[in-house]
A protein has these predicted regions:
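P-loop NTPase motor domains
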Residues: 2-37, 48-334, 405, 414-449
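Short, polar loop/linker segments at the starts of domains and inter-domain junctions
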Residues: 39-41
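Conserved ATP-driven motor cores of ASCE-family P-loop NTPases powering translocation/secretion/packaging/pilus
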Residues: 326-432
Length: 449
């Protein structure tokens, strides 16, 4: 006999099968479940979201870009985009926004962010700390591979800090990067040491590194050590090129306090060696300003970080405080949309590629959107995050007179085969304490009547 389920009961069963997610902003993203039931994937405000999957699975077009559009429907929210392909810049750039890039080719007038290092330092709450931080980022890669040259490179870093100290405290002009770096490249050792002596805090540095006494400077002859230090100083100065050595007055401080302005960091792999220190500094500056107790920026900040782990390519760590922002940024109004192809690539964003800090930092992402993973560590980590459950298996006996054997085994809620079978545009959603749900995101054309 065939019994039909009453329509009312069938509707109740379908309602019970729908995931119980909290409501997000703008009604969420249109999707459908395995059975074809329509569902709205929420994009919660203030919740960090991690999106992972191999290339070509639709991480950007199906989720991250539409999610960013929903969050930016709030006119008070500011946004920072990090990307490699200018996808977000082409979609979200508006008149008045700023774009950080090594090259200014093809950009609208006044769109290029022309950073002024001196003005940035003067606007900071602690000038000396800002000077030290800028110097550390510029010399970080040299110091990491210093070897026996450590003392010379450290001396060059301290010399650069001394120059910034003189410009910030002893002059009134906000000299552009082009003017400052151009002058440093042309100065002789004697002229540079005489310039450093204008600030009392540099006197000890001059005696320790160069054997230079400002009170008895007449007849001073630069030592061989001075020449070695200048070599490493000029190596760091060579990083100032392209847009990073332009004449301008832009600062991160001003961006955070300008209403309705978004910032785009387009990382060009062709100029990665030059761009990396500046990109890492800008991201850390944004994070520090937003998390600071003294920050007067009340507007919520959305950071869309698409393939930001590529900053660590080439075996160089790119620690800008990502996991600190993920775990502590919610109270400060900082929200992250992080996209990566592999969770192991995030190790490069932790200090010294520390995998334990990177794994622990995943606690700052209550929502994960997992498209098809491509490596075993990412798969195993996702299965751990998504949880496990006991499944009962019954094994039939060989003889009909024997009893069947029943076993209970602890298995992941999403198996490796289920992850491997995910088609482009299909992903598992895990939000807070809800069970993972498989959805297929609907393209905009599919939502038309």
């Amino acid at each position: 006999m065939h019994y039909e389920i009453p329509p009312r009961m069938e509707a109740d069963l379908q309602a019970q099968a729908l995931p119980r997610w909290p409501q997000g902003i703008g009604g969420g993203l249109a999707a459908e479940l395995d059975g074809g039931a329509a569902v709205s994937v929420p994009v919660p405000e203030g919740v960090n979201i991690l999106t992972v999957g191999v290339t070509g699975t639709g991480k950007t077009c199906f989720f991250t870009a539409p999610a960013a559009a929903l969050l930016l429907s709030d006119p008070q929210r500011k946004a920072v985009f990090f990307e490699l392909k200018a996808t977000y810049a082409n979609r979200f750039f508006r008149p008045g926004d700023k774009l950080i890039s090594y090259r200014a080719d093809g950009l609208p007038p006044r769109a290029l962010f022309r950073w002024n290092m001196i003005r940035e330092i003067r606007q900071s709450a602690d000038r000396e700390a800002e000077i030290r931080q800028i110097s550390e980022f510029l010399f970080r890669e040299q110091l990491t591979a210093a070897g026996q040259n450590l003392s010379w490179i450290a001396a060059a870093r301290d010399t650069f800090s001394g120059v910034l100290r003189v410009v910030v405290d002893c002059t009134r002009e906000n000299s552009s990067n082009r003017e400052l770096i151009g002058a440093l490249r042309q100065q002789s050792v004697s002229d540079l040491l005489s310039y450093l002596a204008a600030h009392p805090q540099n006197h000890g540095l001059l005696k320790r590194i160069y054997g230079y006494d400002s009170a008895n400077a007449k007849g001073y002859q630069p030592t061989r050590r001075s020449g070695d230090v200048m070599f490493f100083l000029h190596t760091a100065l060579e990083q100032f090129s392209g847009a990073f050595c332009a004449a301008g007055q832009d600062t991160i401080h001003d961006f955070l306090r300008t209403e309705g302005q978004n910032l785009f960091l387009v990382y060009d792999l062709a100029s990665a060696e030059i761009s990396r220190p500046f990109m890492v500094y800008f991201l850390k500056k944004l994070k520090d300003e937003k998390l600071s107790n003294r920050c007067a920026v009340s507007a919520p900040l959305l950071m869309v970080l698409d393939e930001v782990d590529k900053l660590a390519d080439g075996g160089r760590s790119a620690d800008f405080g990502l996991f600190q922002a993920a775990t502590l940024g919610r109270e400060a109004g900082l929200q992250l949309l992080l996209t990566t192809q592999s969770l192991e690539q995030l190790y490069g964003l932790a200090p010294q590629f520390n995998e334990h800090l990177a794994t622990a930092g995943l606690a700052g992402f209550p929502m994960t959107v997992a498209f098809r993973p491509g490596d075993a560590p990412t798969l195993h980590t996702l299965q751990t995050l998504y949880g496990s459950d006991y499944r009962e298996r019954t094994i039939s006996p060989v003889s009909r007179y024997d009893r069947p054997a029943t076993h209970c085994e602890l298995e992941p809620l999403v198996s490796a085969a289920e992850f491997a079978a995910l088609a482009p545009g299909t992903a598992y959603i895990k939000l807070a304490d809800a069970r993972p749900v498989k959805v297929r995101f609907l393209h905009r054309k599919e939502r038309l009547p």
